[in-house]
Amino acid sequence: MGTAILLFPTKTYAQDKFTVNGKADFVSDYIWRGADQNSGFSIQPSLTLGYAGFSINVWGSQTLSRWNVEIPSKEFDINLSYSSNNFSVTVSDYWWSGVNRPYGHYKDSHFFEGTLTYCFGKSFPLTLSWSTMFAGADKNEEGKLQGSTYINASYQISLPADITLTPAIGFTPWKGYYHNKAAFTDISLKAGKDIKITDNFSIPLFVQAIVAPIYDRTYLVTGFSLGF
């Protein structure tokens, strides 16, 4: 469920070439769509295979600090995507039941979601996404699927010293997994910069301030990434 961070060194391939990318994000805390995942300092590895606009991504999160709780935080997600120009569509299988919990209970512990994303381009770097859960454990008190939906808008701003500033806002339009009515889930401001280590290697570093109106919570998160 995490947001991808650009990795260095990087290679550019033609769209019809098979690509393999791996990375590990290290984050001071794990906040997803305004919700604290009770993870604390965590490692979030991912593996992505891509070909001709299609990709399959496996993403995970594992707490490195909060082991003294009943169920330590652990997540394993699978994402299937297709991208063309500025548009992408993704189908995700989320599982976040925790350490030593069974994975195969698809009706009770997996959340299946579809996401549409559109980026307007470099001249107007606004990105809009709409994500709706359509199967699995996303059910109301009556056991019926509730179609929990999350809408996000972000705008990337390039600043001097190669710093990128990204304000973003998230909203849920109706009652569901996120809240009992329509509400703003998260408002954030993220600053990122690639820290040069050598001429051929840099480490992306970010700091993000997050306000979660529906939970009346605030967070200040930092992290860095390594990958190929």
How would you name each of these model-derived features?
Residues 1-19:
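Cleavable N-terminal export/targeting peptides
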Residues 13-19, 86, 121-125, 158-166, ...:
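Short loop/turn motifs that connect adjacent beta-strands in outer-membrane beta-barrel proteins
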Residues 15-65:
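Short glycine/proline- and aromatic-enriched beta-strand/turn motifs that initiate or cap beta-hairpins
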Residues 16-20, 39-43, 50, 72-76, ...:
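Residues that define the transmembrane beta-barrel architecture of outer-membrane proteins
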Residues 24-30, 54-65, 89-101, 124-136, ...:
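Transmembrane beta-strand segments that form the barrel wall of outer-membrane beta-barrel proteins
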Residues 105-175:
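Detector for outer-membrane/organellar transmembrane beta-barrel domains
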Residues 157, 189-191, 195, 216-228:
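Outer-membrane beta-barrel "beta-signal"
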Residues 164-197, 206:
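Outer membrane beta-barrel transmembrane domains
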